[in-house]
């Protein structure tokens, strides 16, 4: 009785779910949701970005990543932190110990500390062992200085956002004037969606998910960053370089991982060749040397032939032949 009751209850809920599904499906077909600016082709996919670190055998372009660090230092660090990266990690980019120490000591934001005499909160110059400090003391201060938007930490940005480095590059170079903006089909945004006007305090960017982003354009003009290596500084170059730097912050062991992967592939290839050679040299020969056993054994076939002769059916077909 209990099983029957449980079965009926299950049937009831299953039927209820099916009914709800068909009702919603019918409503979706008869009254589909209205298109939005994001779904009508005004949101753009990230542009292509070719970096030296791309691909299964990619390696970092140390000069480009150093330029990207310079862009982060002079532009991005005013709002964004790198909590998972230590100053001493910069040695992987080719900086010497003395240069790393100088970078840490001259960093604009000091590291939170405690006054050893009074026990009160204090700050000190950064050391190579310290992680990059946040430019804000807390989340409330960060939101207060950015129109209530919290600037995200950039340590893992290229892994946390779909599109990775191309998304970062496209976002930084994608700010545009909303008035007169058209999609690839030639449709004008504000004519198709008059209510899509960018709210006050936000900035139009077709590469952002909802087209409006709180971050103002960080790269506004060519020459904004003067590269130490003499590379021509343009907005496009700045965006590419800082995207390459953020790939490194997210995957500092990328080159090691690629190297280990290559070694493993070579090992598997050699092991496969050796296994095939062992098969052809040992097992295939051993297989040919195994004597047949059973009805096809030559001795058994000879005995059957003699038995047919003794039975007077010599020359007749083998038993079962033709079946």
For the regions a language model picked out, list residue spans one by one:
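Post-cleavage N-terminal segment of exported redox proteins
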Residues: 1-59, 275-293, 297, 301
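The canonical Cys-X-X-Cys-His
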Residues: 72-83, 242, 246
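Selective detector of the "anchor" transmembrane alpha-helix that sits immediately C-terminal
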Residues: 258-283
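Extended, hydrophilic extramembrane loops/domains of integral membrane proteins
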Residues: 207-251
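Acidic/histidine-rich catalytic neighborhood
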Residues: 55, 64, 85-86, 92-93, ...
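Electrostatic cytochrome c docking/interface patches
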Residues: 44-70, 81-100, 230, 250-258
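Membrane-proximal low-complexity regions enriched in glycine and acidic/polar residues
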Residues: 111-213
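Cytoplasmic C-terminal tails of single-pass
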Residues: 288-323
């Amino acid at each position: 009785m209990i099983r029957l009751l449980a079965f009926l209850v299950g049937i009831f809920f299953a039927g209820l779910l099916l009914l709800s599904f068909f009702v919603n499906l019918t409503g979706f077909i008869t009254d589909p949701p209205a298109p939005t600016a994001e779904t009508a082709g005004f949101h753009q996919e990230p542009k292509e970005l070719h970096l030296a670190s791309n691909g299964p055998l990619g390696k970092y372009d140390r000069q480009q990543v150093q330029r990207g660090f310079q862009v982060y230092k002079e532009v991005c660090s005013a709002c964004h932190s790198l909590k998972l990266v230590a100053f001493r990690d910069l040695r992987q980019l080719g900086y010497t110990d003395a240069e790393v120490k100088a970078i840490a000591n001259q960093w604009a934001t000091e590291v939170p500390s405690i006054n050893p005499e009074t026990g009160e909160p204090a700050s000190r110059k950064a050391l190579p062992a310290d992680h990059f400090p946040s430019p804000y003391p807390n989340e409330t201060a960060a939101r207060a200085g950015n129109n209530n938007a919290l600037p995200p930490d950039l340590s893992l940005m290229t892994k946390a956002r779909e599109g990775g480095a191309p998304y970062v590059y496209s976002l930084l170079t994608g700010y545009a004037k909303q008035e007169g903006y058209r999609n690839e089909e030639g449709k004008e945004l504000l004519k198709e969606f008059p209510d899509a006007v960018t709210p006050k305090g936000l900035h139009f960017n077709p590469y952002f998910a909802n087209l409006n982003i709180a971050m103002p354009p960080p790269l506004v003009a060519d020459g904004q960053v003067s590269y130490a290596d003499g590379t021509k500084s343009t907005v496009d170059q700045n965006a590419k370089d800082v995207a390459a730097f953020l790939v490194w912050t997210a995957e500092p062991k990328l080159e090691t991982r690629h190297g280990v992967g290559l070694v493993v592939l070579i090992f598997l290839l050699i092991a496969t060749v050796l296994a095939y050679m062992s098969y052809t040299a040992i097992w295939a020969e051993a297989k040919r040397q195994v004597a047949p056993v059973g009805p096809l054994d030559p001795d058994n076939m000879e005995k059957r032939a003699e038995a047919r002769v003794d039975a007077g059916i010599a020359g007749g077909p083998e038993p079962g032949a033709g079946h």
